[in-house]
From Swiss-Prot:
It comes from the Bacteria. Residues 7-146 form the N-acetyltransferase domain. InterPro entries: Acyl_CoA_acyltransferase (IPR016181), GNAT_dom (IPR000182), YlbP (IPR017274). Keywords: Acyltransferase, Transferase. This is Uncharacterized N-acetyltransferase SERP0741. Its EC number is 2.3.1.-. CDD domains: NAT_SF (cd04301). GO terms for molecular function: acyltransferase activity, transferring groups other than amino-acyl groups. Signal peptide: none annotated.
Length: 146
């Protein structure tokens, strides 16, 4: 299995994400986010991925939130928003999502995730807790504490 790599934001990033647009949820495309960040090549990329050969097969964004999330993490000044965890169809069920999630957990900060595309059961098996609340789009909110 490949290692998790920090993805830089540059002209190639859109090419790397092209396969995800062909099958995925349009809310996960990251097009506008990329365009906004490509302007400043020095910006710190929140994107991480796993390659098989030269092909990006799994990706996610980790957004470090500095404000206190009183509702879910009252004892923490920082948490991570795990955003857009996605694995290409032909590479699913091979452990790539779990590998990305374990990479996020290595930060030893609380994590907040939104369960989209029937991913709630996966997050629950990985130690996340259902907070019995939905985001404005109707997706379940899950949290993980170190």
């Amino acid at each position: 299995m490949g290692e998790v790599k920090h993805l830089q934001i540059n002209y190639k990033t859109d090419e790397l994400f092209a396969d995800f647009r062909e099958f995925g949820n349009k809310n996960l495309y990251m097009i506008e986010e990329l365009k906004g960040q490509m302007i400043d090549a020095s910006s710190d990329s929140p994107f991480y991925g796993i390659f098989v050969g030269n092909k990006l097969v799994a990706r996610m964004a980790l957004l470090d939130k500095g404000e206190v999330e009183e509702t879910y993490f009252p004892n923490s000044n920082y948490y991570i928003l795990l955003w857009k965890l996605e694995v290409l169809d032909t590479y699913q069920r091979r452990g790539y999502a779990k590998q990305l999630l374990n990479f996020a957990k290595e930060n030893k900060k609380p994590i907040k995730a939104i369960a989209r595309n029937n991913s709630k059961a996966f997050f629950l098996t990985q130690g996340f807790k259902d907070v019995a609340t939905k985001n404005p789009e109707g997706h379940d909110i899950l949290i993980w504490n170190p």
